[in-house]
UniProtKB/Swiss-Prot annotation:
It holds the Pfam family Rax2_2. The chain crosses the membrane at residues 1106-1126. It comes from Schizosaccharomyces pombe (strain 972 / ATCC 24843). Disulfide bonds: none annotated. The gene is rax2. The lineage of its organism: Eukaryota, Fungi, Dikarya, Ascomycota, Taphrinomycotina. InterPro entries: Rax2-like_C, Rax2-like_second, Rax2-like_third. Belongs to the RAX2 family. Interacts with for3 and tea1. It is found in: Cell membrane. This is Polarized growth protein rax2.
Length: 1155
């Protein structure tokens, strides 16, 4: 302990006394106390609470602001960040609208992706998901008529021309999409089958190619077997061989065909028919052997030349017995020799089937122009096209003139509704060296009647032959005036290449457990494919809550949820070799809802309390080390389930600090020592110090949650979260305003000296001329509130010293160096009993409060006179020895109650006000009943003659006064502001009473009846330096509803216009209420400019400069006297023995610092 002499203490205070009077003025700091955890100053702004998720920006000084202003309700939001830009997708489930928002830092844009008015898609949008690895968003669609069917679509969020592409279909419901490090997505849910779309040999509905009038062969009878034309030589579309006796059909395909069979259709009304035919290979003229089923004998037979056709069947099939793979084929048909020149063969249609295909491409000659219903495929075009070069891998057509208006359309023979995939075949350009001549093509797929087409931009400069997926999903069959088709258009000035289109029927893969992994290739010309993980089939998708990749460079997964098997409980690990592994200690004993992977550490949250074997207590949250393979707790966990884990990096004191953030259904987290830290369902863990962070230590307030958005522009801190309020300051029930204009911290340093589980209820300043303060702190323990009185240093964050226990409702009375703690306690019979404790701050001892304890009833108001001897109590009170009613006076030095002369039979005093600085009389505001049954609401007490009497103007007050405040203009001129309830209407009123007794209504631009007012104060302009008004102001505190219906916890009013002073918030983001306003006399640390005030006294007639000059002379004389005594003291001290002073104030401060 340091050694101090009384001499040096006197020297110190003499110097402070001198500096104070020469450089400072006395001012009053103001503290607002109430039920709040954060606040804004001179602002009532708060966050939009309509959205389930929002986006915020934090500046370097720590303040938060809303980044995106949207007004959608019932919304889902996800985001994707790509190359420093943020893309936000908003789903309004009620309106069935999906919007894409982007460019928030420059020119914000909003683009509609889906809407109920957009008829391009069937079903209802049920959910959206965003890929955090690639700039893709996904949407799931469900169908009212197919409740067990879900479609998944996706789109690139960076494209201004959004192209929606079908991703997958499942038979069942999709719950979640998890995006993994190996460019894949895990789809989980309750489904049994999934359509892979990547099968190249699936059932083929139709396959057709481009057809030009300028065909490859000059023979007018040649036909393209992949397109459809009509033989217009006969109105009945029948072939007439009478002139030559032979019809030769030369058919070619623009791709190699593995021919399987030929089908001949007979024309039912024909009397004659084709009798014989041969199939010939045009390359060498050889006849191809065929087999067929003889309808007359029932036996299978073989033929080559003059294969016989039978006309009594609708159709007849002939199979290629030795296989035939080629681009072309020729069919030569002969009559029966009896036909005349005008007869016709009764053959209506001819079809060619590929091997392993369930459907066909056709050449039926039965399109609509021929008078038939049109059950065949066809193609059409506009513009000029030329044949490909001879070196091409297959014959194709290319647009002759770049930039010319052109189009190509393909009409498949789809007769019934189905789900399919449409693919465009692009011939490779390296074979004929045409890559530089090719550009892009726009593909529009018209899949259903009255629906907008699905559009895709396709790059045609493909090195090798490949199929490109244009569309997957529903395909409507022929209906009234509609058939599905594909339209190709050149993009910009590109030369369009056209070849063929194929339509594949969707095939499904069995997924019995509802969990499948899919490759999410971002190559638009490739299809996604299923990744086989046999080990994953041991887990059900409906039991999975999270799947996360590990950051070890391999494709390793943690999978969690609500399951139990041979690999452990609720969490398993799958390595890169597709082997499942259990976690140590048999996993966790409850469901796991979320995983967050950070380096070697993985954080788990859920509804578990221990490891699976019960050996390690975790309490809803755990950390797992991949290296040591050990579980560890975070402090002592939380008091409720954790639902989400992420990272949150925040600016604190101008530096970025990184935390692991947790969200869930909890309101406390526990330190390793067992201390509880209050939260609002969101808390931060510091992995460096391995400790929980209390919100007020961050320097700003959070009523909700904030998570980092990785990949966004590093010059900004952007977060995803939901804050029900945005406040600049975090605190525990207190906001402090200093008269020092340089002090704008608003949070007293002693707040952070208290443990986070202690809430500040009241403060007082019992120590004269020093920085010590008394604080009433409360805490909740086992649903019971306990409190204590602490001493702390108002200028240093020294750990406070606990003095004595108290009640949570206790309040302070200060008499110089004596602190009185009192509380209004109600017993089981609702009888109020007051408890008093007196503590002397100089002797550190308790005083006698027996006489004080004789006061009965509820205390509403307490003031002390300037002698620190008389305590004035107001309330619903009585004291037997003095006979006081409602208003009682306790003389502290004599420890007795003063007898007051009055004729009241009942009284309840709400406010006590000194009338002027002479301390000779005071106003008593409340409700009073005289022995004559008359009622008053404002009385005056004269201290000199000890009487209570009516005052001028009181009869005009409309009802009981709840609060009163007095503004003094001079010794005899003042105004009293009265707030109360009217007797006639029970509405609240605000009136002003002047010193002459005149009373008038005082209107402010607030909603008085909707407001809760707990304090009314008059302040001078220098008392709260942050208020930009150089005039006296009225401050209303509580919960004030302003004229625009916004709320503030305290407002300042000038000329009857009110503006927010303090907007406080509770833990849940609701508006906080100020309960009490405490003023402290303090020294200003910087010189203040004093404004001269002229007096009202005529016999002086001069400004108060005279008083100031006289005061300065007196101070100078006093300083000379004290300086002389100091010289004497120095000589005495030099020749004297030095003795320790153990009870001086400095040593007391040192004691606090060491505790």
């Amino acid at each position: 302990m340091a050694i101090y002499s009384s001499f040096w203490i006197r020297l110190y205070f003499t110097f402070r006394f001198f500096c104070y009077f020469l450089t400072s003025v006395v001012a009053s700091d103001v503290s607002f106390l109430g039920d709040f955890s954060g606040f804004n100053v001179l602002s009532n702004s708060s966050a939009n609470t309509d959205l389930s998720s929002q986006f915020f920006e934090q500046t370097n000084n720590g303040s938060l602001s809303s980044l995106i202003d949207t007004s959608y309700s019932n919304s889902q939001i996800c985001y994707s960040s790509w190359q420093g830009d943020l893309y936000v997708i908003v789903l309004d489930s009620e309106q069935q609208t999906v919007l894409l928002q982007s460019n928030f830092t420059s020119n914000p844009t909003s683009l509609e992706i889906f809407s109920s008015q957009n008829t391009s898609f069937f079903g209802n949008i049920s959910a959206i998901f965003c890929d955090d690895k690639f700039p893709y968003a996904y949407a799931t669609f469900t169908f009212s008529d197919k409740p067990s069917f879900t479609s998944i679509y996706r789109w690139n969020v960076t494209n201004s021309n959004v192209t929606i592409e079908h991703f997958y279909n499942v038979k069942g419901n999709v719950d979640s999409l998890f995006f993994l490090n190996n460019d894949s997505v895990a789809i989980s849910g309750n489904f049994t089958e999934i359509s892979p779309f990547s099968s190249s040999n699936g059932p083929q509905i139709a396959k057709l190619a481009f057809r030009s009038n300028n065909s490859f062969s000059q023979n007018s009878l040649n036909r393209n077997l992949s397109s459809v034309s009509c033989d217009l030589t006969d109105s009945y579309s029948l072939w007439d061989p009478s002139s030559s006796g032979l019809v030769s059909i030369y058919a070619w395909a623009p791709y190699l065909i593995d021919f399987n069979r030929i089908r001949f259709y007979n024309y039912e009304s024909s009397e004659n028919s084709v009798a014989f035919f041969s199939a010939i290979n045009p390359a060498d003229g050889t006849v191809l052997p065929l087999t067929h089923y003889d309808l007359e004998t029932g036996l299978s037979s073989t033929c080559d030349v003059n294969c016989s056709l039978q006309n009594f069947a609708n159709y007849q099939d002939f199979y290629f017995s030795k296989g035939y793979n080629s681009y072309q084929i020729e069919i030569q048909m002969f009559g029966n020799g009896e036909a005349t020149e005008n007869s016709a063969f009764g053959l209506s249609s001819l079809q060619f089937f590929e091997t392993n295909q369930n459907s066909y491409f056709d050449d039926s000659y039965n399109q609509e122009s021929c008078g038939f219903p049109g059950l065949n495929s066809l193609s059409s075009y506009e513009g000029n096209f030329e044949a490909s070069f001879s070196n091409a891998s297959m014959p194709y057509w290319i647009q002759t003139i770049a930039g010319e208006q052109a189009s190509v359309s393909f009409f498949p023979n789809i007769t019934v509704p189905t789900n399919g995939t449409v693919q465009l075949l692009i011939p490779g350009c390296t074979y004929d060296n045409t890559c530089s001549q090719r550009g892009s093509v726009i593909a529009n797929v018209y899949f259903a009647k009255n629906k907008q087409p699905a559009t895709k931009l396709v790059q045609q400069a493909s090195d090798f032959d490949q199929y490109v997926s244009l569309y997957s999903g529903y395909l409507q069959g022929f209906s009234d005036n509609f058939r599905p088709y594909v339209e190709l258009l050149p993009y910009k000035n590109s030369r369009m290449v056209t070849h063929s289109i194929r339509f594949l029927e969707q095939s499904y893969t069995n997924v019995s457990n509802g969990l499948v992994f899919v490759n999410t290739t971002t190559d638009v010309n490739k299809l996604p494919s299923i990744i086989e993980f046999p080990a994953a089939s041991k887990l059900r998708g409906t039991a999975i809550s999270q799947i996360k990749s590990l950051s070890n460079g391999n494709f390793s997964l943690y999978m969690t949820g609500n399951f139990s098997d041979n690999y452990g409980n609720n969490v398993v690990y799958m390595d890169s070799l597709n082997h499942l592994h259990s976690f140590p200690n048999n996993g966790l004993n409850g469901w796991v809802s979320y995983i967050y992977v950070s380096g070697d550490s993985s954080y788990f949250g859920g509804n578990f309390t221990h490891t699976g074997d019960g050996s390690i207590k975790l309490n809803y949250i755990a950390m797992y080390s991949e290296t040591s393979r050990n579980w560890s707790s975070l402090g002592l966990g939380t008091n409720g389930p954790v639902t989400h884990i992420g990272s949150t990096s925040l600016f604190i004191d101008g530096k970025i600090e990184s935390f692991i953030s947790f969200q869930g259904d909890f309101n406390e987290v526990y330190t390793s020592e067992g201390y509880a830290i209050s939260t609002s369902g969101f808390s931060l863990w510091n992995p460096s110090s391995k400790s929980w962070v209390s919100m007020e230590k961050l320097g700003f307030y959070m009523s909700g949650y904030l998570f980092d958005i990785p990949g966004f522009n590093s010059t900004q801190r952007i977060y995803s979260g939901n804050l029900s309020a945005i406040a600049s300051y975090s605190t525990r029930n207190i906001a402090h305003f200093s008269s020092d204009s340089l002090n704008d911290t608003f949070i007293p340093c002693y707040v952070n000296a208290f443990p986070s589980y202690i809430r500040l209820e009241d403060i007082a300043y019992p120590f004269a001329n020093n920085s010590m303060i008394a604080i009433l702190g409360s805490e909740e323990m086992e649903d019971k509130c306990t409190a204590a009185v602490y001493f702390a240093n108002s200028t240093e964050p020294i750990y406070p010293k606990r003095i004595l226990s108290a009640n949570c409702s206790s309040k302070f009375i200060v008499l110089e160096d004596c602190l009185i703690i009192y509380s209004n306690d109600t017993d089981e019979s609702d009888i109020v009993k007051n408890t008093f404790v007196s503590f002397n701050t100089t002797s550190n001892s308790l005083g006698n409060t027996t006489a004080l304890s004789q006061l009965k009833g509820h205390i509403n108001s307490v003031i002390v006179d300037d002698s620190y001897n008389n305590i004035f109590f107001g309330g619903n009170l009585s004291e037997q020895s003095s006979g006081c009613v409602g208003f009682c006076i306790f003389e502290y030095n004599s420890s007795s109650w003063r007898n007051i002369s009055h004729n009241l039979i009942s009284a309840e005093v709400q406010s006590i006000l000194w009338v002027n600085e002479t301390y000779s009389s005071m106003y008593l505001a409340g409700k009073f009943v005289w022995d004559t049954s008359d009622v008053d609401y404002l009385l005056m007490y004269n201290f000199d003659n000890n009487t209570i009497m009516s005052c001028k103007g009181s009869s005009s007050i409309p009802g009981p006064v709840l609060l009163a405040s007095l503004k003094s203009q001079s010794k005899d001129e003042y105004s009293v502001l009265l707030y109360g309830t009217e007797v006639s209407s029970s509405d609240t009123y605000l009136n002003v009473l002047n010193s002459e007794g005149a009373i008038n209504s005082y209107s402010l631009d607030i909603h008085l009846n909707q407001s809760t007012i707990n304090s009314i104060d008059f302040f001078e302009s220098n008392q709260i330096s942050q208020i930009p008004i150089n005039d006296s102001i009225i401050v209303l505190s509580g919960l004030i509803v302003l004229d625009d219906s916004s709320k503030a916890s305290a407002v300042y009013c000038v000329n009857k216009s009110c503006l927010p002073l303090l907007t406080a918030f509770k833990d849940n983001g609701e508006a906080g209420i100020v309960r009490k306003v405490v003023q402290q006399k303090s020294f200003s640390s910087s010189a203040s400019k004093m404004i001269p005030v002229t007096t009202k006294y005529d016999h002086i007639g001069q400004p108060r400069y005279v008083v100031i000059i006289s005061l300065g002379i007196s101070i100078g004389v006093m300083f000379l006297i004290m300086s002389g005594s100091i010289v004497v003291e120095i000589i005495h001290w030099f020749f004297s023995e030095h003795v320790e002073t153990l009870h001086d104030y400095s040593n007391f401060l040192k004691e606090l610092k060491t505790q």
